[in-house]
Amino acid sequence: MKVKVFRVHGYFEKNGRKFKFTKEYRGIKEEDVKELVYSDIGSKHKVKRNKIFIKEIKEIRPEEAEDIVVRRLSLEL
């Protein structure tokens, strides 16, 4: 099993407004990353899972990661 880097695009609804997000995570498969998105967005913004909408999950190369923590963790290996 190899850890990959994924970029996630989506939005969530809170108080009748929509907020876009783009996040980068490390994971083995897309399902793991989807679970991380629900957990992260839900806990930070107090939003239920049914109010979080994921438009796209795309695997990217570690060098393309904009999040410095994700990039450094991926390139150290």
Curated annotation (Swiss-Prot):
GO molecular function: large ribosomal subunit rRNA binding; structural constituent of ribosome
InterPro entries: Ribosomal_eL20, Ribosomal_eL20_dom
Highest taxon above the source species: Archaea
A GO BP entry: translation
One Gene Ontology cellular component: ribonucleoprotein complex
Keywords: Ribonucleoprotein, Ribosomal protein, RNA-binding, rRNA-binding
Pfam families, sorted: Ribosomal_L18A (PF01775)
Keyword presence, Ribonucleoprotein: yes
Family affiliation: Belongs to the eukaryotic ribosomal protein eL20 family.
The protein's assembly and partners: Part of the 50S ribosomal subunit. Binds 23S rRNA.
NCBIfam families noted in UniProt: PRK00773.1-1
Name of protein: Large ribosomal subunit protein eL20
